[in-house]
Amino acid sequence: MDNLFEIDETKRLRREEAAARLRDLADVLARNNEVEFERDGGRITVHVPDEVNLKIEVELGGDEQELEIELTW
């Protein structure tokens, strides 16, 4: 059986703060093939290949709108 590690975090931020976090992540991805995440005193390093699949999903309707950005490989 494969071990699954997952971080699922939801925070309410100002739009500018969310953009800054996305920008920081984009900068790290542009410079390195690794991204580090910290959670509950632990740290995980994700190795990202040179080519990835980018999925952008928009859901409109109802009370909640959604823009989802996903990288897979």
Where are these regions (language model features)?
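Long, charged, low-complexity intrinsically disordered regions
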Residues: M1-E6, P49
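Predominantly single-stranded RNA-binding modules in RNA-associated proteins
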Residues: E6-D8, D63
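C-terminal edge-of-domain segments
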Residues: N53-W73
